[in-house]
């Protein structure tokens, strides 16, 4: 069964995340300026500070919720996906899959252009029904216990 889904992360969850980021034991990380041993220390500190003090999660929620979000269960896995339907009566589905460590947010700016080209100087007949799933364990899809039974055809049943 496919059901509508609205992304709404409770303020208490966000506050808990911010608290964990603020209290991270930075002294445990070796202060190496380069990227040879992983993420650059200064970059990581800077982006962490940005995330807890300036990033607007609710603005992001509004952006992703401007699309039709859904959840469905496939073989016991709750999969989240975005579906943006074109006004093209002969539209074909276009499946966009993110990789690791990506997510559906990589496609948020291109979804409307693919589904509604007429709004960007194109023709309605060029529009696709765009489907963008959050792969299992990413975004708002639940992780699997084992990936052995999970195949692309299983995900494509969405």
What annotation goes with each model-predicted range?
Residues 13-86:
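Non-catalytic accessory segments flanking enzyme active sites
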